[in-house]
Curated annotation (Swiss-Prot):
It is found in: Mitochondrion membrane. The modification N-acetylserine is found at residue 2. The chain crosses the membrane at residues 31-48, 80-96, 103-119, 131-147. Disruption phenotype: Increases frequency of mitochondrial genome loss. Its main location: mitochondrion. This is Altered inheritance of mitochondria protein 19, mitochondrial. Keywords: Acetylation, Membrane, Mitochondrion, Transmembrane, Transmembrane helix. It comes from Saccharomyces cerevisiae (strain ATCC 204508 / S288c) (Baker's yeast).
Length: 157
């Protein structure tokens, strides 16, 4: 009988960091942290254009034919960073204004949208030694999961 409570205590200790993070979603602090990271991106890790690699003669990939720009970018642009930072700050204000359900849904949605826009680029930035986009994607993923769980746990009442 004493072995079972010991395993429950160990399980609680293992899950306690996740419970603490989930408890933080009652506050606007994780969203404000993400907004601050995104807003500081143009200063800490500005995006730059990567020159295209030379392809063999008469071999033009179709993605280059229909692409808007001829050079790829590493990292997110200043406009994108400030836009998503503003959206995170608006969601944080919603939670600060005691609208937990809508604020959590708003933050989860915009965090997921950031992952759609910048998630793949964050992995390609690793080839050029840039880890900041991966940090931003990781924090956005954590916000999307935690605030999304908070939003879905409300039961849509």
């Amino acid at each position: 009988m004493s072995a079972k409570p010991a395993t429950d205590d160990a399980k609680d200790e293992l899950l306690s960091p996740f419970r603490r993070l989930y408890a933080l979603t009652r506050t606007p602090y994780p969203a404000l942290a993400n907004a601050a990271l995104l807003a500081s991106t143009p200063v800490l890790s500005p995006s730059f254009k990567v020159p295209p690699t030379q392809s063999p003669a008469l071999s033009i990939p179709m993605s280059r034919v229909f692409s808007k720009s001829s050079t790829a970018r590493i990292g997110i642009t200043t406009k994108t960073a400030l836009f998503f930072s503003t959206m995170q700050a608006i969601g944080a204000y919603m939670i600060y204004d005691n609208d937990l359900e809508n604020g959590a849904g708003f933050i989860a949605t915009w965090s997921a949208l950031y992952l759609i826009v910048g998630g793949k680029k964050s992995f390609s930035a690793l080839r050029y030694g840039r880890t900041w986009p991966l940090v931003l994607s990781s924090v956005s993923l954590a916000n999307a999961v935690l605030y999304g769980q908070r939003f879905l746990a409300t039961g849509f009442q």
